[in-house]
Every structure is written in C-alpha cells, then in structure tokens.
C-alpha cells in the first residue's frame, strides 16, 4: 500500500507533508524548496513546466503561464467574480460547453481541474522521490467557504493526478489540527486564514484530541492576489500620470508589475519603504521608459485598507453563529502568507483583544494539518477526532421559489437530515427537486447545485402525496440528495455534481492524458540524464586524448575520435533521441575503456622493466633498503 500525504493546494503556493516517525514533516520538492508555486506553463518549444520553473519564465511567456487557477475551480463562467478575475490575468479564458471555465495554454484549452491536477501530479512525483515509495492517496485541503461544486472539482483534480482523495478538509480546520495536536485542556480557537486567493475564519473548540468546528465564514474571492492588484493599479496609474502610457495594455509589462508588486508587498512586512525599479518597462517615440517608484508601508496600508476591513464582518458572523464573543476566544491562529502583513496582525489583535499566536509557519501549517488527518486515516495518529461543519445552508426550492433549508450552515458533518414535502397541484405525478446552497431566502438568489425528477407518483389531490427528501453530507462536505414517495416507496437519488463539473468520461480521459504525460516526463528525464552522461563521457574522452595522445595506438585513437564524433553529433543535433544516443554512448564508453586498458598495460610494462633490467627496484647505491614498518591503528 502506498503512503498517504497531506496537500495544501493553494492559490499562490502548494505544500505537501507526511507523518514520519509519528510527527508531521513538510516534504521538499525536487528543487529542494518547501513551497511549490501553483503555476503551470507551456514553453514556446512545447515543454510543460510546473512550479518554480513555470513562475520564473512568466514574464517572457505571460499568455501561456497559468496561475491563480484555484479562483476558477468549480465556478461558472458567468460568475461576477470569474469575470473580474478574467480582466486581471494575461492568459485567455473562455466559457466551457457546460457553462464552466476553460483556460488556454499552448494550443489547447484546459479545465481548472486539469491545471490543478498538473500541480498535484508534480507534488505526487516529488513526494515519491523523497519518500522512495509510491504515493497514491492524499488528504487535500480547501477553503472552508468552498461550496459543493468547488469541493467536487478539487476531488476530480486529485483523481486526474492519480491520487485517491481520502478526505477533503477545510484549511482553517487543518491549521487547528497542526496548532492543537499537543495541547492539553480545553481551548476556544479562532483561525484567521488569509491566503493567496481565499479568506476563511473558523471558530473551534479543542479539547483532549477532539477538534470541533463551531462555526465558519469567509470569502472565496479575497486574498493576497487582491493586495498585489492594488499595488499594480497604483503603479499603472502613477506611470500613466507621468508618461501618458497605460501599462495595462501590455501583457508582458503587467507580468513584470505583478512580480514586482508581490516582492514589494513581502518586503514591506519587515521594512518601512521599498523601491520598485523596472528599467525598460516600455517605450514610445522618445525612447525607452523606466519605472522607478518608492512605496512606503503607510501608502500600502492606505491602498489595501478596505480589503482588510472586508475580513471583519465574516469574523463577527462566525462568532455570532458560534454563540461567542471575541473575549471568549483563548487563542487566535494566523494562517496564510498574507497574514504576515503588520496591518492585518494589528486589526486581528484589535478585534479579539489579544495578540495572535505566532508559533507556527503560516505557509506550512495547513499542509501539516492535512498530514495529521492523513495520519489519522492511515492509523498512524491516534486519539484525534475531527468534527467539521458545512459552511453554507443547503436547501430545496419550494412553492413560490422559496429556499427551504434542510441543513443549516455550521451543521457538524457527516450528517443526514430528512423533511417531508407534498405536491403543489392536483394529480401531479412528478416533482422536480431543485437543490441550492446559500443564505438567501429565495432559491433563485442562491447557487444551484443540481436538479432531478421524482416521477411515478400516483395521481391524488394536492397536499396528499408525501415525499421525503433526504440530504446526506459525507465527511468531505460532498452532498447526496434522495427523494422518496412514501406511498409507493419509489426513490430517486443523486450525488450532487456541479453543472460545471466533469463527467466520468471526461475524468477518465484526463486521467489517461495525465498518465501519458507522466510517461512522457519520465522519458524526457531519462533523455536529459543520458545527454548529461554523454557530455561527461565526451569531456573525459577529450581529456584522455589531450593528455595521452602520444601513448594511444594510432588505430585505437582513430576509433576513439570517430566514436566521439558520433556522440557529439547526436548531442548537438538530436539530444532527446535516446534510441540513437544510447548505442553511440555505449560504443564510446567501450572504446574509452579499451584505451584505458591499453594504457594500463603499457604502464605495467614500463614499471616492470627498471634500468638494470630486473624487476626489483632498489634504493640509492650503497644504501640498504629499509623494510617499511606498519602499525595497526
């Protein structure tokens, strides 16, 4: 059986962790780093890059570099937040056939699930290389405020990447697991999680290994990306005021601005001001233009003040739902890189009246919590019980378009609840069950999760038939709905899959493509390794020729030169063709080995024939040869 790892699949960065010797540890990626940028790209030569290498080339290849894909997961193209994000990214986005989102990379269109799967596939491969064994199962975290379709999309991404997703858990809950694993006694903990693209606030009760979520709230479209965008907008406005040039029209310039904005924001968490210096950002008839601006911490705080304020109402609502006041909270845990900003730390401290806990790494804590949950499921971690909640009310549409709640928000999961409904008109033989998620009183104002028909109801006056509707939420927060006519026992059941979700056929196709790409990646790695070995062998052969040319027999020297030329030609013209390079490499290695053997024979012959013709060497004339003394150490 393969290992189970915990994965924080983030908007900006992703992290993976595992239980080793009973303790959670972060797994470094192939580049030796603990954070993997959630970035995927196709280069002009058709090579696919994931992580740091994809992020590094984003400035020169903005249209084919996909980032912040989490903001599109499980969302409809018409969603106002999706439309807002489309205006800010340099890559192309279009409506998918099912009403969801597709992004263009290279000459192909991909779903957000496929892009996320590419990130997960890299994490899986790097974890396998680090652990030295197969990784085929994972616990993946999502924002607490992710709805049903976003959770399903995340699970699909895991399947495409070749991972069995044992559990989807909420990011703040995972953080609380990491924080409270060794804590004794009872504590009320608030987890304030502001990441690259999402914001969550969760209130938990932690007591002797039981982690119970009391309430959760948040905004799935508020995060560090929005803070970066405020800096980008300010730079564009300032540059336009000074030069008359609008940098928003230049995709390459925007990518440079994004990188500079993120860097400046990070620096201003530890210094009072920073210089943003972007030479040759653009050009006009008068020549090249340079952007040089000083950004102070106070100016940044002015630019983002309203974004920070947007995090306050969800905190108030979560506390209200939990039946607590700020002073009832014993500890506040900050999660997500954006919480390193001093303004956010001050605001949180003002709200709760206590300094936030700073003993955990906000970038890594979610993955560590996911690894703990993975350890619980694998039996490696004992005496830990996680009781999470559903973040949004689940309801069905009833007469007049009203959303009638079945499971209120912040209900502990897994859970199962039923309610009896009836027909709205005489002799009605079927009913449509319209399932929605959200807090609005009218069904049309909430998010549709799915619709299905229960038919075969015997004709009767309205109000007579009794139809039992049951909602069943599993531990992943994923919903199954069933409707049963109590008179006939006739039942209809669906697991809710979003209208923007993937069909089973699409998922299987994507799994095959991902496996094929993994095989292609393996062949590419082998080809690169062989090329490196060939270049090293060429260097060794050239060195041997240069140093010992006069001692190598002419026919062997000619053979060596020919074999070197054959390898050099393939390395220079067709280095990825292992079918040609492997035999040429083997031939060169064999010939070089023959050269070495011939030279060794010559050296042996020379050593055995001293100036006196004997095989024994002697000291200087008249001196006795002294036996060497050996002492055991």
From Swiss-Prot:
Domain of life, per lineage: Bacteria
Listed InterPro entries: ATPase_NBD, Chaperone_DnaK, Heat_shock_70_CS, HSP70_C_sf, HSP70_peptide-bd_sf, Hsp_70_fam
Triggers of expression: By stress conditions e.g. heat shock.
Sites bearing Phosphothreonine, chain numbering: 198
One of the record's GO molecular function terms: unfolded protein binding
Keywords for this protein: ATP-binding, Chaperone, Nucleotide-binding, Phosphoprotein, Stress response
Protein name from the UniProt record: Chaperone protein DnaK
Pfam families in the record: HSP70 (PF00012)
Spans traversing the lipid bilayer: none
Gene (UniProt): dnaK
Main function: Acts as a chaperone.
Organism: Thermomicrobium roseum (strain ATCC 27502 / DSM 5159 / P-2)
Region entry Disordered, spans: 601-633
Homology family: Belongs to the heat shock protein 70 family.
């Amino acid at each position: 059986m393969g290992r189970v790892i915990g994965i924080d699949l983030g908007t900006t960065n992703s992290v993976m962790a595992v239980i080793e010797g009973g303790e959670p540890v972060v797994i470094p990626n192939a580049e030796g780093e603990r954070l993997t940028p959630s970035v995927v790209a196709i280069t002009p030569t058709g090579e696919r890059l994931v992580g740091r290498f994809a992020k590094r080339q984003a400035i020169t290849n903005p249209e084919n570099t996909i980032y912040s894909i989490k903001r599109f997961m499980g969302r409809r193209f018409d969603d106002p937040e999706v439309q807002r994000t489309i205006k800010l990214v340099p890559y192309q986005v279009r409506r998918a056939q099912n009403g969801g989102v597709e992004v263009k990379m290279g000459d192909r269109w991909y779903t957000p699930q496929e892009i996320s799967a590419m990130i997960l596939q890299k994490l899986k491969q790097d974890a396998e290389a680090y652990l030295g064994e197969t990784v085929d199962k994972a616990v993946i975290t999502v924002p607490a405020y992710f709805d049903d379709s976003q959770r399903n999309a995340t699970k699909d991404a895991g399947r495409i990447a070749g991972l069995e997703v044992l559990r989807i858990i909420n990011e703040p809950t995972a953080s609380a697991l990491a924080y409270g694993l060794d804590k004794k006694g009872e504590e009320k903990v608030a987890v304030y999680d502001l990441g690259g693209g999402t914001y969550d606030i969760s209130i938990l009760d932690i007591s002797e290994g039981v982690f119970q979520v009391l309430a959760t709230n948040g905004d799935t479209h508020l995060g560090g990306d929005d803070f970066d965008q405020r800096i980008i907008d300010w730079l564009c406005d300032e540059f336009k005021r000074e030069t008359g040039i609008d940098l928003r029209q230049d995709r390459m310039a925007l990518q440079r601005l994004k990188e500079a904005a993120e860097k400046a924001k990070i620096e201003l968490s530890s210094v009072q001001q920073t210089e943003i210096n972007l030479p040759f950002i653009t050009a006009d008839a008068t020549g090249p233009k340079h952007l040089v601006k000083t950004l102070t911490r106070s100016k940044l705080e002015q630019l983002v003040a309203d974004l920070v304020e947007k995090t306050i109402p969800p905190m108030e609502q979560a506390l209200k739902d939990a039946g607590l006041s700020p002073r009832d909270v014993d500890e506040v845990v900050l999660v997500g890189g954006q919480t390193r900003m001093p303004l956010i730390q001050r605001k949180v401290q003002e709200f709760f009246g206590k300094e936030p806990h700073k003993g955990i790494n906000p970038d890594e804590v979610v993955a560590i919590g996911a690894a703990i949950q993975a350890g619980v499921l694998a039996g490696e971690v004992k005496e830990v019980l996680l009781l999470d909640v559903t973040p949004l009310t689940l309801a069905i549409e009833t007469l007049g378009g009203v959303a009638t709640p079945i499971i209120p928000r912040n209900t502990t999961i897994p859970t199962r609840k039923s309610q009896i409904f009836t027909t709205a008109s005489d002799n009605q033989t079927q009913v449509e069950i319209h399932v929605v998620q959200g807090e609005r009183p009218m069904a049309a104002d909430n998010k549709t999760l799915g619709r299905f028909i229960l038919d075969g109801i015997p004709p009767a006056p309205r109000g007579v038939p009794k139809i039992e509707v049951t909602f069943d939420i599993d531990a992943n927060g994923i919903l199954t709905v069933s409707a049963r006519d109590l008179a006939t026992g006739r039942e209809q059941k669906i697991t809710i899959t979003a209208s923007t979700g993937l069909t089973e056929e699409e998922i299987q196709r994507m799994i095959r493509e991902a496996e094929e790409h993994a095989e292609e990646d393996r062949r590419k790695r082998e080809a690169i390794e062989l090329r490196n070995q060939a270049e090293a062998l060429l260097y060794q052969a050239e060195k041997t020729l240069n140093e010992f040319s006069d001692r190598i027999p002419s026919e062997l020297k000619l053979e060596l030169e020919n074999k070197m030329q054959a390898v050099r030609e393939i390395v220079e013209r067709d280095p990825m063709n292992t079918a040609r390079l492997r035999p040429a490499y083997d031939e060169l290695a064999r010939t070089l080995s023959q050269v070495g053997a011939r030279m060794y024979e010559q050296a042996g012959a020379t050593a055995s024939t001293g100036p006196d013709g004997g095989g024994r060497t002697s000291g200087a004339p008249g001196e006795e040869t002294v036996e060497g003394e050996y002492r055991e150490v």
